[in-house]
């Protein structure tokens, strides 16, 4: 799977309640949104950014493990940039490629996984988790 490039990223709070036809409730589940830009300097390393707009950027460093049991795994750490609104932020991401259906029609590559806030910031506690989906642009 090609990782280098741009991916549309969205994370969602893990709330088991159904939203029905309430669009505002559905929107309130979005934890974060932006664009992952990945580079792969080696087959096992990943660097890049998560740009959420408005100066909110995390610098990413990660590992790619294509030889683990099961699908390739991605373990990524996101660090806030000094002098920006993300100063002091730290998030961890764990993901793997979405299954590519052999008979899928117009399927776009995806990465699915989970995220945890590794350090508290802006009055929000560490340990908050969410699920994420990143879709190839």
Regions found by a protein language model. Give the residues of each.
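Short, solvent-exposed loop/hinge segments that bridge or flank secondary-structure elements
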Residues: 1-53, 119-132
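Beta-sheet ligand-binding and adhesion/scaffold domains
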Residues: 2-14, 63-137
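Predominantly extracellular/secreted and cell-surface proteins with exposed
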Residues: 29-86
């Amino acid at each position: 799977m090609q990782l280098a490039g741009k991916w549309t990223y969205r994370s969602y709070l893990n709330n088991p309640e159904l939203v029905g036809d309430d669009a505002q409730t559905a929107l309130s589940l979005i934890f974060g949104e932006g664009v992952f830009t990945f580079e792969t300097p080696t087959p096992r390393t990943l660097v890049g950014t998560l740009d959420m707009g408005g100066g909110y950027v995390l610098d990413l460093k990660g590992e790619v493990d294509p030889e683990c049991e099961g699908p390739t795994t991605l373990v990524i750490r996101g660090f806030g940039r000094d002098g920006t609104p993300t100063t002091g932020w730290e998030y961890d991401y764990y993901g793997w490629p979405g299954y590519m259906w052999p008979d899928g029609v117009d399927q776009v590559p995806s990465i699915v996984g989970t995220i945890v806030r590794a350090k508290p910031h802006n009055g929000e506690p560490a340990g908050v988790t969410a699920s994420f989906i990143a879709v190839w642009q």
